[in-house]
Amino acid sequence: MNDSAHIDYARYDHIRPLLWTGDALELLDQRKLPFVVEHVRCDSSDAVAEAIHSLAVRGAPAIGIAAGWGVVLAAREIAADSGSEALQKLEPALLRLNAARPTAVNLAWALMRMRRVLAAAGPDWRDVLAREAQAIADEDLAANRHMGALGAGLIAPGSGVLTHCNTGSLATAGFGTALGVIRAGMAQQRISKVFAGETRPWLQGARLTVWELQQDGIDATLIADSAASHLMKSGLVQWVIVGADRICANGDTANKIGSYQLAIAARHHGVKFMVVAPSSTVDMATADGDQIEIEQRDPGELFGVGGVRTVADGIHAWNPVFDVTPGHLIDAIVTERGVIAQPDLARMQAAFGN
């Protein structure tokens, strides 16, 4: 069921994390939200790569879009008579952008698109790059709105939902993936209650998700990550809805650390588990989750909150950013191409090919 026509996008889709000005890429600095609304101006591809690595911009679709504009900025620093010549000169910048966040497949996918159009371009290769970067952003927004309606159609009226990390407008070109489903579900009066996990250590749920929902006038309840199983046992939620940074050929899904344990708890308590992501997040070349490189960040991120240290000196920490949820724990993967129920290799191949 697709009820996108009944969604008031003026209310539910007005936050934009990226703005191309024609001269630079303006990024809403997500490290400073919700108390400071400030933009980072990126005038070079290296500035974009740093913004991606430092989490000024985050969310798999958003960093792919940012990388596309990063290539446009890199193009201003070289001279070339054709796209193929430019591609050789731009390769170092492309590699630096790709290395900024290794787990999210959207980053490599966006850069591959830029490479492909550049290789075939003539003397107008700079214009070709700019058009492709804009197309990546436009297609993402359209996909998110479509996925929102598809995912909402799976939810029975009166349901409660739990989400993790931030998968909204801040993580995409707009509207969001998992949060787009929640927005659509609220607009269609299918969802009665929204819960959001805080998502340590960067607190994307606490700092970003509940702030986004507040901007839309959606009442959301924040919980500690450790309260999720108890919440499910209470019967207050019928769905856990998350995004994805990489979806493998068998349905295994890499997402923000903590997603795996939510899927385990959801299966135990009879709560359904939905993954929402554009098809650009699907990586049919990766057989299963064991093949995914899991990004490790500075252990120091676990030592405090808001710049205040809460851990004694001399303590060691382990800080993986993502985990992998096995496909057999996922009830539905929603992309703009449709819904894959109980994903496995055969169903994924039927939807996305080999």
Swiss-Prot record:
EC class: isomerase
**One of this protein's Pfam families, by short name?**
IF-2B
Enzyme Commission code(s) on record: 5.3.1.23
Report the family membership: Belongs to the eIF-2B alpha/beta/delta subunits family. MtnA subfamily.
* Catalytically driven reaction(s): 5-(methylsulfanyl)-alpha-D-ribose 1-phosphate = 5-(methylsulfanyl)-D-ribulose 1-phosphate
Catalytic residues, per the record, are D245
Q: What is this protein called?
A: Methylthioribose-1-phosphate isomerase
Q: Which UniProt keywords apply?
A: Amino-acid biosynthesis, Isomerase, Methionine biosynthesis
- Which residues are the signal sequence here? none
Role noted for this protein? Catalyzes the interconversion of methylthioribose-1-phosphate (MTR-1-P) into methylthioribulose-1-phosphate (MTRu-1-P).
The record places the site described as Transition state stabilizer at: C165
Is Isomerase tagged as a keyword? yes
A molecular function annotated in GO for this UniProt entry is: S-methyl-5-thioribose-1-phosphate isomerase activity
- Gene3D superfamilies recorded for this chain? translation initiation factor eif-2b, domain 1, Translation initiation factor eif-2b, domain 2
Organism for this UniProt entry: Xanthomonas campestris pv. campestris (strain ATCC 33913 / DSM 3586 / NCPPB 528 / LMG 568 / P 25)
Q: Which InterPro entries does the entry mention?
A: IF-2B-related, IF-M1Pi, IF_2B-like_C, Initiation_fac_2B_a/b/d, M1Pi_N, NagB/RpiA_transferase-like
Q: Which gene encodes it?
A: mtnA
Q: In which pathway does it act?
A: Amino-acid biosynthesis; L-methionine biosynthesis via salvage pathway; L-methionine from S-methyl-5-thio-alpha-D-ribose 1-phosphate: step 1/6
Q: Where does substrate bind?
A: R58, G59, A60, R101, Q204, N255, K256
Does the record bear Isomerase in its keywords? yes
Protein's GO biological process? L-methionine salvage from methylthioadenosine
